[in-house]
């Protein structure tokens, strides 16, 4: 890698860090690009060179967070945990993301995640957490633990959508119980019908 490329990547990282901090503080819509570039120590136009819009910052953050969660989830699955434990771990990972991002940024993150007007991401997005959970459901299906008519990837999507919805719409006293029930109901919905 050339010195120029190294410097470009370092600048992008500084901008991403400064933007993430500003988004946590104010939310994406209210974030001030001037404050972001001042914190990163770069010219105003440099932000738009690296990130054409503030939404592009969230896309980069989304990719990194999904990759991080998928790596952790993959290591967890490699230890041979059962399906119910895997679903519970997925809940834990999403709630951990909320703690790391903070309430404002987490809501922006999910709003962009499901937005029909979201910008196209550069490398595409394979939603690796969904794929890993779908594969785990498929393994349970092959072992006779999940109904043969269940579509594993659809069940993974439905489950994760449920987590996201409950995470942004419920408060702490109710949330734990609702998420535990989501795991139970998901297991019940996939059970082999005798």
Task: List each language-model region with its residue ranges.
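Basic, helix-initiating cap at the start of DNA-binding domains
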Residues: 1-26, 30-39, 56
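C-terminal peripheral helix-coil segments that are non-catalytic and often amphipathic
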Residues: 2, 89-96, 130-131, 135-143, ...
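Hydrophobic/aromatic residues within well-ordered alpha-helical segments
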Residues: 11, 65, 69, 87-90, ...
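Short hydrophobic/aromatic patch on the recognition helix
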Residues: 41-51
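Alpha-helical DNA-contacting segments of helix-turn-helix folds
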Residues: 51, 58-65
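Hydrophobic alpha-helical connector segments
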Residues: 60, 74-101, 159
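All-alpha amphipathic helical-bundle segments outside canonical DNA-binding/catalytic cores
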Residues: 85, 121-126, 142-158, 174-178
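Short secondary-structure transition hinges
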Residues: 95-134, 168
